[in-house]
């Protein structure tokens, strides 16, 4: 029966990396671990201090600080305890931590380096945390290139690998996955050669021009992109067909939570592809964003941030703690938006619904055509039986299918061609 990353740790947590190399599920555990609040516990990347093990952190009197994000407190606590319980992660070393939240630059950036027992490194970028500034930076990716967090990620990789010279993995969940891919594209060429794999766990992609400018094709063979069945975040600006889809025990947007991803033995439960209905929605969203000019996107994002900031909450925890107060502030702020901006917002939203409507219509037409072709094929199949030749023996009466089975095989220098190849 399939479980989650927590069950994986119970089963394989005692096998060291020198016996069982890092796999996709390990990457999820480490990327999620980067969400914990290691401030003051792990050496800052700017100070080049000593490393510390998980065991040493667990013994600190302020260990409860790790679970400051109450949204995932229960899951993060189970993850931490699961990592501590076995040899695989217990003595893993942590170093080069950084956590920046800069309101004036509209950026939230956090990263940490894990040193595994086989000597390899895993550089993990935190995804969007509970800060409202962090969510604003996510939206900024729609029109800014690069956003400050992406620039920081490149500096981080070059700095850490300048001190630690081992081969390394790099990864992140959500925005962290975007930062992992971006930093791999833009880091120094001699550093890039040491990258083993790049993990993007339901991380958003990039505008087409960014992929071209940053030479994504130079690293694409090392990218492991994992998406849940109903992925939306990870399909933003997605132009890379090389992704894998994993099953989740949650539904809809809640599948973005990596603790919901299903694991069997030491691997994820893979499924065929994103749900078709979700694909249509994702295509509409991407087409909509790319159809807007920079001024429209900037106005939309800035107004949204301005309205939410009117609640005076610094993070989502505070925003939702007094939901009524926050929403009253939002409604008041919306009323104060000037007429010109309000009209632009209405036009932007109308265009989203129009594109979505067209996408659904196109899909319905395509479905009808497919069904029509299928019916015609079935009718044609029945008519294709070869009629008996009066001059031939009764035993010679065959259908096309049986004729193919009895056809002589090519021998000598001839080879049978494979379907779909010329």
At which residue positions do the language-model features occur?
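Alpha/beta hydrolase fold serine-hydrolase catalytic domain that processes acyl esters and thioesters
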Residues: 1-25, 30-92, 96-112, 116-121, ...
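Catalytic cysteine-centered active loop of the rhodanese-like fold, especially the PTP/DSP P-loop
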Residues: 167-169, 182
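Gly/Ala-rich beta-loop-alpha elbow adjacent to hydrolase catalytic centers
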Residues: 172-176, 180
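Short glycine-enriched nucleophile-adjacent loop
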Residues: 180-189
């Amino acid at each position: 029966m399939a479980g989650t990353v927590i069950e994986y740790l119970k089963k394989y947590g005692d096998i060291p990396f020198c016996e069982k190399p890092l796999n996709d599920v390990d990457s999820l555990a480490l990327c999620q671990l980067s969400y914990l609040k290691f401030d003051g516990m792990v050496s800052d990347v700017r100070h080049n201090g000593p490393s510390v093990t998980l065991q040493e952190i667990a013994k600190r009197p302020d260990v409860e600080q790790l679970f400051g994000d109450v949204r995932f407190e229960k899951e993060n606590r189970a993850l931490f305890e699961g990592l501590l319980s076995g040899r695989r992660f217990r003595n893993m070393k942590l170093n080069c931590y950084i956590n920046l939240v800069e309101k004036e630059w509209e950026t939230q950036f956090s990263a940490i380096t894990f040193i595994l027992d086989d000597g390899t490194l895993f550089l993990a970028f935190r995804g969007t945390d509970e800060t409202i500034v962090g969510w604003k930076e996510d939206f900024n990716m729609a029109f800014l290139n690069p956003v400050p967090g992406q620039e920081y990620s490149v500096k981080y990789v070059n700095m850490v690998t300048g001190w630690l010279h081992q081969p390394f993995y790099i990864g992140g969940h959500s925005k962290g996955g975007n930062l992992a891919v971006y930093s791999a594209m833009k880091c120094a060429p001699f550093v890039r050669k040491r990258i083993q794999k790049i993990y993007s766990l339901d991380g958003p992609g990039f505008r087409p021009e960014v992929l071209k400018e940053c030479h994504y094709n130079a690293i694409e063979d090392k990218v492991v992109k994992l998406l849940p069945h109903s992925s939306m975040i990870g399909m933003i600006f997605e132009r890379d067909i090389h992704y894998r889809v994993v099953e989740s025990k949650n539904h809809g947007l809640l599948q973005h939570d990596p603790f919901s991803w299903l694991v069997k033995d030491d691997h994820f439960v893979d499924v065929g592809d994103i749900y078709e209905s979700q694909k249509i929605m994702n295509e509409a969203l991407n087409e909509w964003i790319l159809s807007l000019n920079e001024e429209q996107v900037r106005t939309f994002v800035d107004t949204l941030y301005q309205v939410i900031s009117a609640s005076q909450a610094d993070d989502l925890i505070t925003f939702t703690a007094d939901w009524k107060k926050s929403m009253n502030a939002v409604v008041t702020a919306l009323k104060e938006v000037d007429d010109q901006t309000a009209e632009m917002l209405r036009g932007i939203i109308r265009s989203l619904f129009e594109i979505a409507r067209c996408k659904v219509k196109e899909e319905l037409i395509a479905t009808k055509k497919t069904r029509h072709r299928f019916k015609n094929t079935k009718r044609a199949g029945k008519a294709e039986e070869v009629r008996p030749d009066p001059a031939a023996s009764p035993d010679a009466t065959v259908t096309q299918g049986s004729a193919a089975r009895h056809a002589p095989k090519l021998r000598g220098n001839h080879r049978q061609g494979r379907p779909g190849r010329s």
